[in-house]
């Protein structure tokens, strides 16, 4: 499946702050209305654990077929592996999906010195006690969030 984009101002649009605007964007992209309804049902079902943070999307993702395939996979309980050249919108899509589903989004950029504790969590001292400090993968799982594992090819084997 190829990523498809519009070239309007390099795919960038001004900051958006409401999920409603994202759903309007999906309608303009002519995403199958039943898929948009399924997103809404999901959001209602998990409204009590929804991400209510005020962070805004910087960009919108364009690409009807990719949107539909990604949402369908997520609704079926699958994980996504987005692979492709640099600057093709993989992170933008992941952030848009997290916002559409109203889930928290955690971004973890891999590097050569990364170890398991920086991803999952580690012990630390707090108030004279050893306590577990969760990493982004652990926290994402606890919160039912989206975890973007960026530049995974840069990690040590």
Spans of model-derived segments:
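AAA+ P-loop NTPase catalytic core and its hallmark functional loops
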Residues: 2-157
